[in-house]
Amino acid sequence: VDDTQAHQPQEAHEPDEAHEPDRPCPAHAGSTGSGAPRHYLTTTIPYVNSRPHLGFALELVQADVLARHHRRLGHRVRLLTGTDENSLKNVLAAESLGVPVRELVDRNADAFAALHGPLSLSPDDFLRTSSDPRHRPGVERLWRACAANGDLYRKHYAGLYCVGCEQFWSEEELDGGRCPEHGTEPHLVVEENWFFRLSRYAERLHALVTSGRLRVEPEARRNEVLAFIASGLRDFPVSRSRERARGWGVPVPDDPGQVVYVWWDALGNYITALDYATDGAAYRTWWEGGDRRVHHVGKGVVRFHAVHWPAILLSAGLPLPTDVLVHGYLTADGRKISKSAGGGAADPVELVGRYGTDAVRWWLLREVPRTGDVDFTEERLAARYDTDLANGVGNLVSRTVAMVHRYRDGAVPQAPLPDCAAVAACGEVAVQVSEALDAFDLRRATGAVLRVVEEANRYVESVRPWELARAEGGGDRRAGGRLDESLAVLVHCCRTLGRELAPFLPDGAARIAARCAGSTLAPPVPLFPRLSGPGGGG
């Protein structure tokens, strides 16, 4: 695979793009044009020792929602994802399979890039650390900048290393002598490496996180970072011997016997993808000139992103991220879903094949709490889809369209909207979604959208359009006017759902918008067919 051809960076999404469903929406307050806020959003980059699992799909979908939301506000957005290919665990995985490392990383990197279609993701760039020509020179430049600041030095070291998470652990950090992330016993590594003077930055990092200039959400993760800093920061190794790395990775500048430690290499992707090596226009626009630089990360790597990475940037004299948004883990039977666990239930592409993109995205956004982990089962996925989308959103839209056809031959009444709870919910939802997403609370954001469904259903049961139609048929002209009003309210609610669901369910939202567009509606068709149980649904 020639990565320079397979994954060319796209132009970042600009606010005047007209593609559905991320176009700027008048219902949301937001700047447009060249002076619009610039949001640079990133995911972590996964190791490619195996194929993707549902746990990483969670992070991709969350970041995609934020990107689509900001585009809809008229903001300029660049969303980066990619793959972390210069790790020892990739080398060991290739050895265990008896294949060249290049063959393994190419094959699995393609599998990660292929998630974008099934999950309806909208990244602007995809960087592969082993083959993208932007990456290595950027890593080298970052190394030299920290060296020039006096923050890199060599020393002999002995430490307990977990290959699974590619990091050293102190004995106090281990859980019964095992890695707290992987449950495996780390092995002793003794060699001479380059170290970074992390201890030099403890006070500055503490001040940045405490003040909110480096925002870590949710609060529990911020407190965890502050406690880690307060416990005393130790300098950490940033290289490994070329021999232990099997010759795979980025050589340390001016020291060919050492390879850059995978975490330094991987963290650098956030700026190397912007042509940091050459001070490119993308770097100046999105990192130096960006209004927000947002990292989406899992809880297991928050220290690297909220402590190690900012310290490296401080050393190099570069701008820091503005936000580190931290999610929990997906578990299966109480155990973290990971590539090593295997199993089809953890494969996002297989899940999409069985249940559809809307079902998978919705479960990840609706079920996962702001803080903590959640256990995944296919039964829970199907039940959540049926409850919220088939019986909720889909049923409301289908019911509304059917009544417009039954009572008005498909023509949407042009009646003024009354002062009622359903209309009020439509007017409030945009702000509620924005506030929830700004707090990185996707469950609250999706709940705000579902409130429109709840109020619309209450409205239907209150006004009972079928009784108004019966009265109109008996000659009651006032009932006919109220029927027009009620149908106008319900169509308004459905159109609001099509708009507000767009960041969360781009495919489903587009179907709703198309079904409810225009002055005359097309006949009803199921938008979210039920996955299980009896009955129809939307």
Would you name each region that the model predicts?
Residues 119-127, 147-160, 172-173, 187-189, ...:
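Short secondary-structure capping/junction motifs at helix and strand boundaries
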Residues 148-206:
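Cys/His-rich short segments
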Residues 430-443:
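Long, non-coiled-coil amphipathic alpha-helical linker/lever segments
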Residues 364-370, 396-407, 416-429, 448-463:
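A glycine-rich, aromatic-flanked flexible loop/lid motif
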